[in-house]
Amino acid sequence: MVDRKEFAELLYGTIINSTNSKENAFEKLSKIRGWLLANTPKRLFRFRRCNEYSIEALKEDQIWGTSIWEFNDPYECVPCYNFETLWGKITQSLESQKFFQLINVLKEGGILPEIKMAYPSIDIEQMIKNIPDVIDEKDVKEKLDILKKYLSIFIGTSFEEMVHRFYIGIQAEEAQKQIACFSEQNNSTLMWGHYADSHKGFCLEYDFQSILKECTQNCIDIRCCNNFMLNYSLAPIIYTKERFDATAYFSTVMQALLYEKNQIPMDLYYEDILIVSKCMLTKSIDWEYENEWRLFTPNFNDEYKPYRKIASLRPVALYMGAKITKENESVLYEVCKNKGIKCFKMLQDFHGKEFIV
């Protein structure tokens, strides 16, 4: 089994924001890509029901994905936020001491590349030239206090709209992707029961190592890459007791609403561009038995479809459930025979003490 704790530390610890250069983003994403190339299992399994769609997909070497809106867990890919943490950062940034530290750094020519990267439409040099040589500290403190009070009122009156935009926005982004789920094992009684029609279905074995490669697309901005710079976005699920904390995304939602209502022509600052990927790879520990790996696509920026073909890959083996009907067994056997796919049937072990097939 793969070390999911190690992957969690790597993924959650990788922060790519609006101030990161393309080179810096490439370096960070390369570490995730390297881990995935080194740790993707040789064998991954997908459990299927016997129906016309799954059998036709088998015949055509197709892997179909599903929108998160069709998943059975209501908390699937649904993050949380911590407003106290966010407000603490806001009030801290509005302290007069912090403000003067920033002014001094700007005057000395510091952090200019990062600010330009985050806010490309702003003339930073001209803004710095407009900073007076002498600043009235008392006046600045009063204005910062006024700004803090305004933000407090703004948040109080707009909070419900922020929360609505937070959940709708992030789930709309996730719904533009399609997901196919795989497991590291094919002998789980629960998996056969939940996803293969109580052993009346079948399980497909895939070799993703044979096709998983570094992406060769020359993207304009690597910072927006949610594929981890691979030709297929394939990664293990991280099982946790708590939903993923997407407070960084809530911060962007707050900015957008603030700029919109006050007609401020500024670029949005993104604190963590990998937020959506992190949400889609976080799942309740209740599902830990699945040992899931998730294949997901880039965004489909068109009309919503609950199911789509997302990859073409022939399975290397097929395992029929112990309770499969004779008719379906015959159909699957013929498909495997014609396509050169190894075919097995799961059997109950009546001699041992364990609940295994």
What are the residue ranges of the model-derived segments?
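Partner-binding and oligomerization surfaces adjacent to conserved cores of proteins
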Residues: 1-357
